[in-house]
Amino acid sequence: MNRLFILFVIGALFLASCKRDGSSEQSSDLDIPDEVVNEGVQELEISEEVMQDIVQNISSPVEMAALIKSLDVPFSAKYLASVDNVDNYTTSFQQAFNLGIFGADLGFLNMYNKTNSVINYISAIKTLADGIKVGQFFDFVTLKRLAQTNENLDSLMYISVHSFNQVDKYLNTNQRGNLSALMITGVWMEGLYLATQVYKEAPHDAIKERIGEQKIIMGDLMLILENYNKDKQFAHLVEQLNELKALFAQVEIKIIPGEPEAVEQDGMLVIVQNEESVVTISDELIGTIIEKTEEIRNNLIGS
């Protein structure tokens, strides 16, 4: 399931950054009259090499939750965004971003088998998805049934990830890559927030290293967001995240090459270059990153 979630994030980053052909005409029932539609904004292309770097380094919220759980850190609902705020998200900018936030929280809840809370987050996701007119891609009846019966949590995760994949594909093919970028930013932001909050209460080197590694993916994510910087809301988002990026710039990451390894992927033998990353981040710096992450995340979700 972790690999599926990673592919969802990677695909969204890739599609949001590539030039797209085709008519800009959309059916009226699918138009979203909001202030984040990017008209006349030149889009950037991300090279395949850069995308491979993202694949190698991104940490999905599911991976982060799995790491946290493996360290015997007890579950705490206080880390999660409150579903009580969902009705306050009235613009598609807010709805797309918080769709990512709640999607990350859903992965965290699933990892800890908190099925009672899962239902509330599925309902919140439905509200936000309907708000940007992508609710048709979520089978909410099946999702709630799986959550209520505690039946096959792998299936619950799979359907959730597949739904987000469909949403991303739809947004990008309908000239709404900006909303996809917001959704992915929400996913990443919440994953980082969860990690930093856990580390604050239960410091562990593995979590500290994973936090430091976010320096890499943040650089790529900022390229995508800056693509929509002509919109004032995106400009404000980028301005806030640049403060965090400046802190991550002080994190040192050294890549140590390892021995190549032959592995089977999709029935084919491929050579994988193993690498080890050594992250150097001071206690003072990670403390500042924790504070800044909390400040930005809470400001963005309105808590």
Please state what every model-predicted region is.
Residues S28-R145:
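N-terminal Sec/ER secretory leader and immediately downstream segment
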Residues D231-S303:
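A cross-kingdom marker for long, charged
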Residues N2-F8:
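Sec-dependent signal peptide recognition
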